């Protein structure tokens, strides 16, 4: 199965309601500044798309979290993923019977070393 990122997102079948959103990286000699969430990003935030919680997680190098465990959310939930250091693979399976991508699986490779550095993976 092919990993999905910003470079190939238009050539693969994304699960319905999944959005990859590139973030603008502002770099200069003093460092890096990245806006991670703005209320005027209508694809990510807006009426009916408010967010209630934000957190970050650090995992030690060489460790895989939930390697043999899947998280299932039986209710409507939007998650926004952002990787600022390291690499992560996010697997998303569509079990919404009314969805045109029902029973589809997408694997998203996200890393700070990729061409676009940071992306939002927005899942409705």
Briefly describe each language-model feature range.
Residues 111-124:
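Conserved metal-binding segment of the jelly-roll/cupin
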Residues 1-114:
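Non-catalytic, conserved peripheral segments adjacent to functional cores
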